């Protein structure tokens, strides 16, 4: 049911279901979360779920598409490319925004990744998220080349490599498995600094 047609109580109920799903997908993954888990966490009866969503996949698709179109895509419009090779603020600012945005929605990203391997609908969504990062990195490569740096880099290839590195790094270090299994401990600040440095050095070598 479209949110615009809901009553205030209906919007509140739907929001509770969505929030419960985000939390449980982050903790248990898509396959480890049942509809009963979601409605129980939302404090609603299982029957209520079907007033708003056809099934669990429909709920995930809605959450992912909303995150993509309402949060991720608009954020790219605010990105200003680096003014100079020593513009550390650009890299730190963009990576901080990326890290915080995806950390808050890691459950959605994990669930989409789990379904993308077998379902075209979610594979398409996953690639839309990836294009967001790739477009920004590719633009930064071209800016560096305009400044006389990274002339041997292929903008799209480099963008894919860095964007996928960011994706996997974030999933491991923010996801429930965490870095502990690797014997590592890293703060948000250190994670952001690491990703920023890798990106900047790839373009400028310093």
Regions found by a protein language model. Name each.
Residues 5, 16, 24-58, 62:
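Helix-turn-helix
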Residues 62, 76-104, 155-163, 189-192:
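Hydrophobic alpha-helical connector segments
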Residues 123, 145-196, 206:
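Hydrophobic/aromatic-rich alpha-helical bundle segments in the mid-to-C-terminal region
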């Amino acid at each position: 049911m479209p949110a615009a047609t809901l009553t205030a109580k209906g919007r509140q109920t739907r929001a509770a279901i969505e929030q419960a799903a985000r939390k449980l997908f982050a903790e248990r993954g898509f396959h480890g979360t049942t509809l009963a888990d979601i409605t129980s966490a939302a404090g609603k009866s299982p029957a209520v779920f079907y007033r708003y969503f056809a099934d669990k996949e429909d709920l995930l698709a809605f959450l992912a598409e909303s995150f993509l179109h309402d949060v991720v895509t608009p954020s790219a419009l605010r990105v200003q490319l680096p003014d100079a090779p020593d513009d550390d603020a650009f890299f730190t600012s963009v990576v901080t925004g990326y890290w915080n945005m995806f950390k808050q929605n890691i459950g959605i990203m994990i669930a989409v990744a789990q379904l993308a391997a077998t379902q075209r609908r979610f594979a398409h969504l996953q690639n839309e998220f990836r294009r967001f990062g790739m477009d920004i990195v590719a633009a930064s490569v071209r800016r560096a080349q305009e400044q006389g740096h990274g002339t041997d880099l292929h903008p799209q290839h480099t963008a894919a490599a860095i964007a996928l590195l960011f994706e996997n790094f974030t999933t491991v270090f923010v996801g429930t498995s965490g870095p502990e299994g690797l014997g590592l401990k890293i703060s948000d600040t250190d994670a952001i600094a690491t990703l920023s440095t890798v990106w900047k050095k790839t373009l400028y070598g310093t």
